[in-house]
Amino acid sequence: MVKIRLTRGGAKKRPFYHIIVTDVRSARDGRNIERVGFYNPVAQGGEKRIELDLARVDHWVKNGAQPTEKVRNLIKEATKSQAAAA
């Protein structure tokens, strides 16, 4: 089964997450199929908080990938922000 989930990066006390498409059997920071965006929960100033390639996310969801609960919320937030920017 394929999932869309977060993989952690960044420094201690300053997390940064990549949003990836991966097999459920892979480790959290292990191999991934595709990187579709990022999430920066501690963004400051002009830094982007979320960047997501919604076309690729939609492609993977149509092909059976299941987003985790947190990623599902991030997709909704990114969709709202892109609609507001347009």
From Swiss-Prot:
One annotated GO biological process: translation
Protein family according to the UniProt entry: Belongs to the bacterial ribosomal protein bS16 family.
GO molecular function, one term: structural constituent of ribosome
InterPro entries given in the database record: Ribosomal_bS16, Ribosomal_bS16_CS, Ribosomal_bS16_dom_sf
Name the UniProt record assigns to this protein: Small ribosomal subunit protein bS16
UniProt xrefs under PROSITE patterns: RIBOSOMAL_S16
Superkingdom field: Bacteria
GO cellular component assignments: cytoplasm; small ribosomal subunit
HAMAP family listed in its UniProt record: Ribosomal_bS16 (MF_00385)
Keywords for the protein's UniProt record, in alphabetical order: Ribonucleoprotein, Ribosomal protein
NCBIfam families: S16
